């Protein structure tokens, strides 16, 4: 059983630090072997998880939700009211979206999401997070100098646009609704979804390209 | 805890790896680590104990290990703590007495498992909410031991409650394996309150904060 004993956990960490080669590939191989031999998981199940998140679960889901919000005002109202409930209309609910909140960009407001304490991310709607989202640079700087961080992503904000950074310190997760790109009047949902980038739903991309 | 993981506002970490870090994985072992962690390998842990375990890593390792290297190390700690494997078995990479193998899952089963894994962290509290939307609140100047979700950069600062989410599982207790509900709020802080006069006057940072982290301003 888990001890929930901080001192014991820290002692084990120090032991691992001193006695185990740091090579991450070896550590993961050891972990997988131990888990498989204990009957906790089958190796094929790991492959199935990777395939599920490559083929079925990813930012294409979020993009579909955003495209619907752009074309259906009633859906957008439901999404802003309760995003966890709204994405069940697509069957996209799941891991880490039990408390999902959608936040909307406007001509005078930009939203950006970070998790400074770990790496919380709305997996079932955006898939696996990019490595930069988990980097020390992004986690440390997004709250302190969001405009400088955005500039590194190629986003330059005028002074007239306010930035709100959402630091995910609880089990709430965020998806940004970017502004609909100009020149997309009359486009159907599939075509609109193709304009939505993963980064725009995290808030590190802002101006999407239409035609 | 006031550990190395509490990165918000710290300086010196350089540019964000926008291009080189665009993909979720750089190596196959990262993919396998992520897949392993998707299954509930250790049912008795809590999400807060997992996070707290990462915080308890040797600080130099936390800063220099890649993300999934930290996960692998934390799971090995959890295996040892939980008794799933001894330290000798971890060193050997094999257990002395294997159990019957787990049945493999298909991709379709995983997709359904993801959908069914929509967890609600709402947990009733035995007190009425102390704060309401629009209230000005102040954060405590310190965290709680051993685990807190009040980052150092947002301590002893004044902000405005912009949402009340009812009561949620309190991570401070979750890290001890206890299931306790407490009112949870989204609090907005001006960038100037957090970072001083050089910050943009219109910018804000929001955090989800539990009631015990807050006092009336």
Give the ranges of each region predicted by the language model.
Chain B
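N-terminal intrinsically disordered, low-complexity, charge/repeat-rich segments that act as generic
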Residues: 1-101
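Basic/aromatic-rich interaction segments and small domains that mediate binding to polyanionic partners
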Residues: 7-37, 79-82, 121-133, 142-217
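Short, structured beta-strand/loop micro-motifs enriched in basic residues and often containing a Trp
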Residues: 102, 111-123, 140-143
């Amino acid at each position: 059983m888990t001890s929930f004993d901080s001192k014991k956990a820290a002692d084990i960490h120090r032991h691992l630090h001193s006695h185990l080669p740091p090579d991450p590939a070896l550590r993961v191989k050891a972990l997988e072997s131990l888990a498989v031999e204990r009957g906790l998981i089958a190796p094929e199940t790991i492959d199935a998880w990777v395939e599920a998140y490559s083929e079925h679960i990813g930012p294409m889901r979020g993009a579909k939700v955003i495209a619907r919000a752009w074309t259906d005002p009633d859906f957008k109202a439901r999404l802003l009211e309760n995003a966890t409930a709204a994405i069940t209309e697509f069957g996209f609910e799941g891991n880490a979206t039990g408390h999902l909140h959608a936040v909307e960009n406007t001509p005078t407001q930009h939203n950006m999401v970070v998790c400074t304490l770990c790496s919380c991310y709305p997996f079932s709607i955006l898939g696996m997070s990019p490595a930069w989202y988990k980097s020390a640079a992004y986690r440390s700087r997004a709250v302190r100098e969001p405009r400088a961080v955005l500039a590194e992503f190629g986003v330059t904000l005028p002074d007239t646009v306010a930035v709100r950074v959402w630091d995910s310190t609880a089990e709430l997760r965020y998806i940004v609704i970017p502004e609909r790109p100009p020149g997309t009047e009359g486009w159907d949902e599939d075509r609109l979804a193709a304009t939505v980038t993963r980064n725009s739903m995290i808030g590190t991309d802002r101006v999407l390209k239409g035609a | 805890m006031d550990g190395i993981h509490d990165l918000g506002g710290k300086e010196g970490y350089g540019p964000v790896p926008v291009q080189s870090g665009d993909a979720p994985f750089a190596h196959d072992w990262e993919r396998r680590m992520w897949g392993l962690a998707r299954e509930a390998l250790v049912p008795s842990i809590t999400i807060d104990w997992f996070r707290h375990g990462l915080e308890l890593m040797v600080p130099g390792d936390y800063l220099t290990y890649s993300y999934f290297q930290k996960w692998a190390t934390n799971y090995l700690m959890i295996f040892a703590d939980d008794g799933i494997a001894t330290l000798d078995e971890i060193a050997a990479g094999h257990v002395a007495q294997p159990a019957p193998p787990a049945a493999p899952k298909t991709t379709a089963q995983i997709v359904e498992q993801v959908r069914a894994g929509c967890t609600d962290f709402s947990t009733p509290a035995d007190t009425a909410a102390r704060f309401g939307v629009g209230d000005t609140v102040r954060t405590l100047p310190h965290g709680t031991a051993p685990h807190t979700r009040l980052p150092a950069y947002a301590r002893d600062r004044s902000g405005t409650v912009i949402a009340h989410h009812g009561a949620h599982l309190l991570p401070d207790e979750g890290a001890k394996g206890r299931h306790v509900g407490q009112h949870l709020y989204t609090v907005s802080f001006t960038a100037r309150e957090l970072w001083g006069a050089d910050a943009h006057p219109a910018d804000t940072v929001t955090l989800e904060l539990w009631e015990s982290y807050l006092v009336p301003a």
